[in-house]
């Protein structure tokens, strides 16, 4: 590019060459100069002076300071040639220091744009630069990226050119922090597209559209931009601008989508920030506007506008208001609309000034002045008192009635703010919709370029919910950049087999994104909290930290800072750590409005306000599910969910386009021009992935082209590499083309489907192409100019001759004009002509009448056409209605999805409630444990009291022993109580563990639900993708229908692929329906499981209540017992006192003795009562223990059932996951098949090389074997015969292998042809559409010419009108038939193809007839014009015109006859097409027979191998066997030669069988691995159960050891089986090696025998070929004779066919020779397949052995199960005996209670202890029996699974055996059907060639007819011009 084209902008874009040379002239030592880290400038320049042993380097800075730095911190410096380079990807040393230095130097010279690989880096200059003028736009228009300096216009031009060339939508993404310049650059891009579109074609309408596009941004900035701390004109909303273009690059329309308007700014701004610009523009406006809006000029008078700053130095609000009004006028805003926006803005300002106060002595509120309310109500068109009333006393719905509710001052203030925010947001959305309507030019749309300008990343002092949504959006966009630049790029290299070392990309942001948007992320928790009425910001915070703190590194607790705002949590984003304040998040997310005030707004007289709230739906007017009103009310969707939905839509739009990234950099925080903060820039470069993206772009291959596209575009560079005489694949052509050019061959790589180029290499190719094209065009122009000059010279010669003739005539006239007779002629001539004028007038009148009739007829025809047009429009409207109905159904589906989401949220809420209940139960358990602790304390106190009693009873010697016994008894009872307490504690722990288990199960179920929902979403995405693919297929099919007459040959090939796609789609749809049913079943299972959990919780609660009651009873008993103990203590004390008194007295009276006796009786009675109470307590405690144990057993059983249900659900989930994986694998089968084919090809080639190597080795051993030949012949003739047979088999298999490899190569060629034909079809379709449009225009012009001819010719026109009417009727009929055929083609493609073929043939014949008639009509019209001109001069010419008219009539009759003949020809062609169809169907049948024959041949080959193994004959029969083998060999060769064509067709079937065998292997391996996993899982489960029982039951240790021993035994058996399998594989490989060596020896011996038989076989082959040649020549000669008798043209065609037939014979001969080699390859492949089949059989046998072993193990397990059952029965019997003993003991205990006073206390205690021991043993036995039953159940399940596995293995073995038997039978039948198939194939080939030639004839005739039509149209136009001139 010439810098002079840029004008004054050149100095800011690129340095001149002299300046660059001056910069690059500095000397640099690359080994010493380097960059070192610096604290102030990040990196500074230094020079290496030396190094030390510890790895440090001594450097010297530019200031002379010497430093020692570690070597790894030094970064190399680039040479001066790269100083201020325009693309940083070209740097020699790509490091942070070099990138920073380059950006810093360019920014210092005000070069703000720099390329970094595929994307552009721009730095905000913070001042205006003259680089955006129109001359700069014109200079960048159409320039390649390498031609012009870096600029945002270059990015826009690149996107524009990619859109036109690649026919793909584009997008330009601006990313960066706030204040980096995203909005300004997006404005310049929009300006560029608008200006360039205006340059392409200047139209009034188009010019208006460009002006409107430029002005739309002004309105959006006024209403959506505001001043922030970092930016004076910051966009507080995101926008995605789609600029739609037509097919030729014309700008057709523009639409805008907005995202996340910051509503909170309307009512509050931080210090230093400002409200939206429109508020201050209105306040700075003229007085008339102030009077209209009732506002003043001071922003401080309004609360909503004065929270922060009120002025901006860089903005003039008054001028901005004028620009806003001008933009609204240009966009066509009506005055009501414009002032409606102003009024609502003013109303919001007055709204903010409204104040309220408390009424004195009342609790109600009232307005503190009504002035502001009156102003706001006036501007909004509502009643002021009603507004205030609705704010203070809103109506709410309670049940079915409405009730007024009083509000507080805070609530009213919040309601006013919410209404203001909602009003402004709705007004802004209305503005965007209005701008979109204005920018919709109703022109055709083809592609679009999207421009994304999203609010930049924000880290403010006070960060709220808006900042979280903004930063989340930037996280998603940065992740999209990483995914597109790093993941997709490197995956493309791997997929295309390009050698590549993966490069990591800085930061992976998915973890942070998941933390925000995953099901239990921040937004999800916020949504969940908004659903609960009692939720607060504090509950949201606690739930957030409970779920994620400590689990996610991106969530942190903030450090308290008194200087800043309070932060509740911090998030680690890619751009830094951001503290968030959650105050008011729930209210912001709900975004609730005062519905009473909204109802007043809906009745407003202000039309704009009423329309804004027209669609608002209250919370009590929700539409029931299933109705079709609208998708979702505004009140039912939160801010977070709406933003998340819009963001997902934006990401899908971006992923459907080709993105172009612009990374905007903020140079400094203070907004000072020219200053660059290095650390700030480095942080942005690291976060944006600039270095990694540049490295990938430099080392990778960012540009790539399909082989066909590359061949089509660059074939002009070397046309010699594309010979027209033979076919060359696209890849081979690309390789030869690039290899022939003088270029750097390291700059490109060849992939599988594409050719990849380094960055900038395509620009070199484009330059070479432009140079070649310029040469071609100059040569073409020279030839054309020479031709034109020759034509001009010839015209000059003709004019000279005409002048000479005219001069001669004038001289002759001058010589005779004075003769007398000549003067007499001059006088008589006018008189004669006057008599003829009347006749001419009469003739003209007749012509006028005839023309009037013709005009009436044409009008009638026009009316008919209008009626048809009306009917077509009606059909179009019907289709539109159908489309709308489908859209409604789609909306219903979306509503159902939303309903499902709601139900999911409700279920989650239910789960939350259950978890809360569980927490309550846990609290109850904690209370119980606390009570247990209290009981322990009481026991401790009782122990103290007992000790006191012991000290007191020591005094009495007589009662010492009794008191000691009592104390012992009491201590034992206390121990028993402690045991009870410990048991209760254990039970509480068990219940608590059960609760915890239920919680874990619930959590697992929630995870299952989330995984199922994800799987459902994936399936829905797959359905959407399949629907999109289906829609594309439908469009392609409709295009094919329009151009079917040109694509008949290719349609047959595409039909099968279409049917396969449709069948696969139906299959996928059915599977999806099955998956949905299974998903619903899973949901029902989850519901059932939740019901079970609820039942378990109920039972737990009941048990807890029972425990509580029992504990209360226990406490009551203890209290009574304590009382008894206290009374007993008192009595013992009294007794002691009495004894002391008795001892003191010594001998007292009888009264005292009676008193003592009474006291003793009382004491004994009390003691008896106490013992009865203790017995009662013990019986009740035993019963309670028993009940508690039973309840625990029931709970354990229920828990086990739940675990079983859980296992089933997990198994179902795994099955579903496997089925989903199967679906995905089916989708990828085509690619796998292709890859497998290529792998097989490489495998065949490797085997071929190995065979050649082995053959070389064998030749060395040939001499030794020849010496031992006689000895071998004498020793074993039988062995020699076997060797000969194996040699024959090897030769046969090698031929088949060669055939297979050649067929694979042919298939590759066919695949490339198909891809090429598909691309050609696409181009042909586009060309056909253009031709169709041209034909329509020409047809209209032709109608006009015909109308003019009607006025000139009366008689001719009458006849032509009749003919035209007939023709048009026929055409209409044909078009209707075509439409019917199109409809039928959508149902059945086969019938449509036939119908369209017939219709096309008829249309072609009619077109030919019409063209011939029009040609003759043009000739007749030209003759008639000559006649009329001659009649004006001479009367004699009138007779000639009559003759010409008669001749024309005769020609017309001849043309009519020709038309009839053409119709007959059409009928004949249709019959031939039917015959061709029949032959095609017969060929299909023959193909199927050939497939069966191929299978029979394979079976025969297997039989031959068996015969080789089984054959045992003597040496004397060797010669006979030799002759038989030779004859059989010749026969096999003849049959194989005849079946070569069939083998080509059946190659795909053989490959399919190979794939099936491989799949069967994989299936067996997968099943074995699954079974191993199941065994491993079973072992783990057994281990877990054994570990859990080990702590509680020591007796279960033996069973655990036994189970582990069995598992070890099974693992050892498995290892032994694997060793056996590996040994068997080794033996098979050794056997195959030995077999290969024997075959090599056989081949050497057989070569000597083949030499003698080769001559005979060659002669026989030549004879057979000659006979076939003769037969083919005779048939073709007969065809040629029949064609010669028809027409002379047929004779020429038959001669050509004869030549082609001879060439075909030669081709057949060459093909036969090539197929012989292929047959050898096929034979080798068949042998390999047999080996593989044998291996599969061996594997099946091994699997069967494994199954047998598994069955043996199952039998062992069943025996163990029987033993377990016996032990269980024994335990049951012992339990019954124990129960009987317990009953006996209870009876004995009752008897002992009666004898308690008389009996011994020790015996009772022994009995009680025995009872307790028996009860403990009973409980232990019960637990053991339960565990044994559970183990038995598990063993039964294992046995069932093993038996099922054995049955499956047997079924697989039987299936494989049947497949092998079928293959062998098919190989046997193949040989018998080969000859018939070959003859049929030859017949079909000959018939197909004939039909192909006939089709070529038809096409040639069509081309001739088209050329005649064009000539006739040209003549008709010339004739029309002549008639107009006359």
Swiss-Prot record:
Statement: the UniProt record of this protein carries the keyword DNA-binding: no
Keyword list, A-Z: Actin-binding, ATP-binding, Calmodulin-binding, Coiled coil, Cytoplasm, Methylation, Motor protein, Muscle protein, Myosin, Nucleotide-binding, Thick filament
GO biological processes: extraocular skeletal muscle development
UniProt superkingdom: Eukaryota
Modified residues (N6,N6,N6-trimethyllysine): 127
InterPro entries with a match to the protein in the record: Kinesin_motor_dom_sf, Myosin_head_motor_dom-like, Myosin_N, Myosin_S1_N, Myosin_tail, P-loop_NTPase, XRCC4-like_C
One Pfam family it belongs to: Myosin_tail_1
Span list, region Actin-binding: 647-669, 749-763
Annotated IQ domain residues: 773-802
Signal peptide location: none
Chain sites annotated for binding ATP: 176-183
Compartment(s): Cytoplasm, Myofibril
Listed PANTHER family: MYOSIN HEAVY CHAIN, NON-MUSCLE, MYOSIN-15
Binding partners and assembly: Muscle myosin is a hexameric protein that consists of 2 heavy chain subunits (MHC), 2 alkali light chain subunits (MLC) and 2 regulatory light chain subunits (MLC-2).
Protein name per the record: Myosin-15
Source organism per UniProt: Homo sapiens
């Amino acid at each position: 590019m010439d810098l002079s084209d840029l004008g004054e902008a050149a100095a800011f874009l690129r340095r001149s060459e002299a300046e660059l040379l001056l910069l690059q002239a500095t000397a640099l030592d690359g080994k010493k100069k380097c960059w070192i880290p610096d604290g102030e400038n990040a990196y500074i320049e230094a020079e290496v002076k030396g190094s030390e042993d510890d790895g440090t380097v001594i450097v010297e800075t530019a200031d002379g300071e010497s430093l020692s730095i570690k070597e790894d911190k030094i970064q190399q410096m680039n040479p001066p040639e790269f100083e201020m380079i325009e693309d940083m990807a070209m740097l020699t040393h790509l490091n942070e220091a070099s990138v920073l230095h380059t950006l810093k130097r360019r920014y210092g010279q005000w070069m703000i744009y720099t390329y970094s690989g595929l994307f552009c880096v721009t730095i905000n200059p913070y001042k205006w630069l003259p680089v955006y003028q129109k001359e700069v736009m014109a200079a960048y228009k159409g320039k390649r990226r390498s031609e012009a300096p870096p600029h945002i216009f270059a990015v826009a031009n690149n996107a524009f050119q990619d859109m036109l060339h690649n026919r793909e939508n584009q997008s330009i993404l601006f990313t960066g922090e706030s204040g980096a310049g995203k909005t300004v650059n997006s404005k310049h891009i929009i300006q560029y597209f608008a200006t360039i579109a205006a340059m392409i074609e200047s139209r009034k309408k188009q010019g208006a559209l460009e002006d409107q596009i430029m002005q739309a941004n002004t309105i959006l900035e006024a209403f959506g931009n505001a001043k922030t701390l970092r930016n004076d004109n910051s966009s507080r909303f995101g926008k995605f601008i789609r600029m739609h273009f037509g097919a030729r690059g014309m700008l057709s329309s523009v639409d805008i989508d907005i995202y996340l308007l910051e509503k909170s700014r309307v009512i509050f701004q931080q210090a230093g920030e400002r409200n939206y610009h429109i508020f201050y523009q209105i306040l700075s406006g003229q007085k008339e506007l102030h009077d209209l809006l009732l506002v003043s000029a001071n922003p401080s008078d309004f609360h909503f506008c004065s929270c922060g700053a009120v002025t901006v130095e860089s903005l003039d609000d008054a001028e901005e208001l004028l620009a806003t009004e001008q933009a609204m006028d240009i966009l066509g805003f009506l005055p009501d609309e414009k002032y409606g926006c102003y009024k609502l803005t003013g109303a919001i300002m007055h709204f903010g000034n409204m104040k309220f106060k408390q009424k004195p002595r009342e609790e109600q509120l009232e307005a503190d002045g009504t002035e502001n309310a009156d102003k706001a109500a006036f501007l909004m068109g509502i009643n002021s008192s009603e507004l205030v009333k609705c704010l203070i006393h809103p109506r709410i719905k309670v049940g079915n009635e409405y009730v007024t509710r009083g509000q507080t001052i805070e609530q009213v203030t919040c309601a006013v703010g919410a209404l203001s925010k909602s009003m402004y947001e709705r007004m802004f959305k209305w503005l965007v919709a209005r701008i979109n309507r204005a920018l919709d030019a109703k022109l055709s749309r083809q592609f679009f370029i999207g421009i994304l300008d999203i609010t930049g990343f924000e880290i403010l002092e006070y960060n709220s919910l808006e900042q979280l949504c903004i930063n989340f959006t930037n996280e998603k966009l940065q992740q999209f950049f990483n995914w597109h630049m790093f993941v997709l790029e490197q995956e493309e290299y791997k997929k295309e087999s390009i050698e590549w070392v993966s490069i990591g990309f800085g930061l992976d942001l998915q973890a942070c994104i998941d933390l925000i948007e995953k099901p239990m992320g921040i937004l999800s928790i916020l949504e969940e909290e908004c659903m609960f009425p009692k939720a607060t910001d504090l509950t949201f915070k606690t739930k957030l930290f409970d779920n994620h703190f400590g689990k996610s590194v991106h969530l942190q607790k903030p450090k308290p800072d008194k200087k800043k705002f309070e932060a509740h949590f911090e998030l680690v984003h890619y751009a830094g750590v951001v503290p968030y304040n959650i105050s008011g998040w729930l209210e912001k997310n709900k975004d609730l409005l005062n519905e009473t005030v909204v109802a007043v707004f809906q009745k407003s007289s202000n039309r704009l306000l009423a329309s804004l709230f027209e669609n608002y739906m209250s919370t009590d007017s929700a539409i029931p599910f299933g109705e079709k009103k609208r998708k979702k009310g505004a009140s039912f969707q939160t801010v977070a969910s709406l933003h998340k939905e819009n963001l997902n839509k934006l990401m899908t739009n971006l992923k459907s386009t080709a993105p172009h990234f612009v990374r905007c950099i903020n140079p400094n925080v203070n907004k000072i021009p020219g200053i660059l903060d290095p650390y700030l820039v480095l942080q942005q470069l690291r976060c944006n992935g600039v270095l990694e993206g540049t490295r990938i772009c430099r080392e990778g291959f960012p540009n790539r082209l399909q082989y066909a596209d590359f061949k089509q575009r660059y074939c002009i560079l070397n046309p010699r590499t594309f010979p027209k005489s033979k076919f060359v694949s696209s890849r081979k052509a690309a390789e030869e083309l690039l290899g022939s050019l003088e270029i750097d061959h390291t700059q490109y790589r060849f992939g599988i489907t594409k050719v990849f180029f380094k960055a900038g290499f395509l620009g070199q190719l484009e330059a070479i192409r432009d140079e070649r094209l310029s040469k071609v065009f100059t040569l073409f122009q020279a030839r054309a100019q020479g031709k034109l000059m020759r034509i001009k010279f010839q015209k000059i010669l003709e004019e000279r001759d005409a002048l000479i003739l005219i001069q001669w005539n004038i001289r002759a006239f001058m010589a005779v004009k004075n003769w007398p007779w000549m003067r007499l002629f001059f006088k008589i001539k006018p008189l004669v002509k006057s008599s003829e004028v009347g006749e001419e007038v009469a003739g003209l009148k007749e012509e006028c009448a005839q023309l009037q009739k013709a005009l009436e007829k044409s009008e009638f025809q026009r009316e008919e056409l209008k009626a048809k047009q009306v009917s077509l429009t009606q059909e179009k409207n019907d289709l539109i209605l159908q489309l709308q109905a489908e859209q409604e159904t789609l909306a219903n589906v979306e509503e159902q999805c939303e309903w499902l989401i709601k139900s999911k949220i409700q279920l989650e809420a239910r789960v939350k409630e259950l978890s809360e209940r569980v927490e309550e139960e846990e609290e109850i358990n904690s209370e119980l444990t606390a009570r247990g602790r209290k009981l322990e304390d009481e026991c401790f106190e009782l122990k103290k009291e007992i000790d006191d009693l012991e000290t007191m009873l020591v005094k009495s010697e007589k009662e010492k022993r009794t008191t000691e016994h009592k104390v012992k008894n009491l201590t034992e009872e206390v121990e028993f109580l402690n045991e009870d307490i410990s048991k209760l504690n254990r039970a509480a722990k068990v219940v608590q563990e059960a609760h915890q288990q239920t919680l874990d199960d619930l959590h697992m179920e929630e995870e299952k639900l989330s995984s199922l929902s994800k799987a459902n979403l994936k399936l829905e995405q797959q359905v959407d993708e399949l629907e999109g693919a289906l829609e594309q297929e439908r469009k392609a099919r409709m295009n094919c229908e329009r151009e079917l007459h040109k694509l008949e040959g290719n349609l047959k090939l595409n039909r099968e692929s279409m049917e396969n796609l449709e069948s696969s789609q139906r299959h996928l749809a059915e599977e999806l329906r099955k998956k949905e049913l299974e998903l619903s079943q899973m949901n029902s299972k989850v519901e059932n499981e939740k019901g079970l959990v609820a039942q378990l919780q109920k039972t737990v609660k009941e048990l807890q209540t029972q425990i509580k009651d029992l504990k209360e009873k226990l406490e009551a008993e203890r209290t009574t017992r304590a009382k008894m103990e206290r009374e007993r203590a008192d009595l013992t004390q009294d007794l002691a006192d009495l004894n002391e008194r008795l001892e003191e007295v010594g001998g007292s009276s009888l009264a005292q003795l009676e008193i003592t006796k009474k006291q003793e009786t009382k004491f004994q009675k009390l003691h008896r009562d106490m013992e009865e109470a203790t017995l009662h307590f013990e019986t009740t405690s035993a019963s309670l223990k028993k009940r508690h144990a039973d309840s625990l057993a029931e709970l354990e059983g229920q828990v086990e059932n739940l675990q079983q249900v859980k296992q089933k659900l997990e198994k179902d989930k795994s099955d579903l996951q496997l089925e989903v994986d199967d679906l995905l694998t089916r989708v990828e089968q085509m690619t796998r098949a292709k890859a497998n084919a290529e792998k097989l090809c490489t495998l065949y080639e490797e085997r071929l090389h190995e065979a050649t190597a082995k053959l070389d080795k064998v030749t060395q051993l040939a001499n030794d074997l020849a010496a031992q030949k006689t000895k071998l012949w004498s020793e074993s003739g039988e062995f020699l015969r076997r060797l000969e047979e194996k040699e024959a088999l090897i030769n046969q298999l090698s031929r088949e292998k060669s055939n297979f490899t050649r067929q694979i190569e042919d298939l590759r060629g066919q695949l490339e042809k198909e891809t090429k034909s598909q691309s050609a079809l696409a181009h042909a379709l586009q060309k056909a559409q253009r031709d169709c449009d041209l034909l329509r225009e020409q047809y209209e012009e032709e109608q006009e010419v015909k109308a003019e001819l009607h006025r000139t010719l009366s008689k001719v026109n009458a006849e032509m009108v009749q003919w035209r009417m007939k023709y048009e009727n026929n055409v209409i009929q044909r078009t209707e038939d075509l439409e019917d055929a199109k409809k039928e083609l959508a149902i059945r493609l086969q019938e449509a193809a036939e119908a369209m073929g017939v219709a096309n043939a008829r249309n072609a014949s009619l077109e030919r007839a019409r063209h011939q008639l029009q040609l003759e009509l043009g000739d007749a019209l030209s003759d008639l014009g000559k006649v009329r001109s001659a009649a004006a001069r001479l009367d004699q010419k009138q007779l000639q015109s009559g003759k010409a008219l008669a001749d024309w009539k005769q020609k017309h009759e001849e043309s009519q006859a020709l038309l009839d003949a053409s119709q007959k020809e059409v009928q004949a062609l249709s019959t031939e097409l039917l015959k061709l169809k029949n032959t095609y169907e017969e060929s299909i049948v023959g193909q199927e027979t050939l497939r069966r024959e191929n299978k029979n041949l394979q079976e025969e080959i297997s039989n031959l191998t068996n015969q080789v193994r089984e054959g045992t004959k003597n040496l004397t029969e060797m010669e006979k066997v030799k002759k038989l083998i030779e004859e059989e060999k010749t026969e096999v060769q003849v049959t194989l030669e005849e079946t070569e064509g069939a083998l080509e067709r059946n190659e795909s079937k053989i490959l399919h069988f190979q794939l099936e065998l491989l799949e069967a292997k994989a299936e067996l391996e997968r099943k074995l691995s699954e079974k191993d996993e199941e065994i491993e899982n079973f072992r783990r489960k057994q281990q877990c159960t054994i570990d859990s029982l080990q702590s509680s039951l020591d007796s279960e240790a033996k069973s655990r050891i036994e189970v582990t021993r069995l598992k070890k035994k099974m693992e050892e058996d498995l290892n032994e089986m694997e060793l056996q399998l590996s040994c068997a594989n080794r033996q098979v490989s050794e056997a195959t090696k030995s077999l290969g060596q024997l075959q090599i020896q056989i081949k050497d011996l057989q070569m000597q025998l083949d030499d003698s038989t080769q001559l005979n076989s060659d002669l026989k082959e030549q004879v057979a070929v000659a006979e076939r040649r003769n037969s083919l020549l005779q048939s073709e000669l007969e065809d040629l004779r029949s064609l010669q008798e028809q027409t002379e043209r047929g004779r020429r065609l038959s001669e050509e066919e004869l030549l082609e037939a001879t060439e075909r014979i030669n081709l057949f001969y060459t093909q036969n020779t090539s197929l012989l080699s292929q047959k050898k390859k096929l034979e080798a492949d068949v042998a390999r397949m047999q080996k593989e089949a044998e291996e599969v059989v061996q594997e099946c046998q091994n699997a069967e052995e494994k199954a047998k072993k598994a069955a043996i193990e199952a039998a062992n397990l069943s025996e163990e199960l029987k033993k377990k059952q016996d032990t269980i029965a024994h335990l049951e019997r012992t339990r019954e005996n124990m129960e009987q003993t317990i009953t006996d003991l209870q009876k004995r205990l009752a008897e002992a209670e009666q004898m308690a006073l008389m009996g011994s206390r020790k015996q009772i205690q022994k009995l009680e202890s025995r009872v307790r021991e028996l009860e403990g043993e009973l409980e232990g036995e019960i637990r053991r029996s339960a565990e044994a039953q559970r183990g038995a159940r598990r063993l039964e399940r294992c046995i069932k699974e093993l038996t099922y596995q054995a049955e499956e293995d047997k079924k697989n073995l039987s299936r494989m055996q049947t497949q092998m038997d079928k293959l062998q039978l098919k190989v046997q039948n193949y040989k018998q059907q080969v000859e018939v198939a070959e003859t049929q194939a030859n017949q079909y080939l000959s018939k197909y060639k004939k039909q192909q030639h006939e089709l070529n004839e038809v096409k040639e005739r069509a081309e001739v007819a088209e050329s005649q039509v064009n000539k006739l149209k040209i003549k008709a136009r010339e004739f029309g011009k002549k008639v107009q001139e006359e």
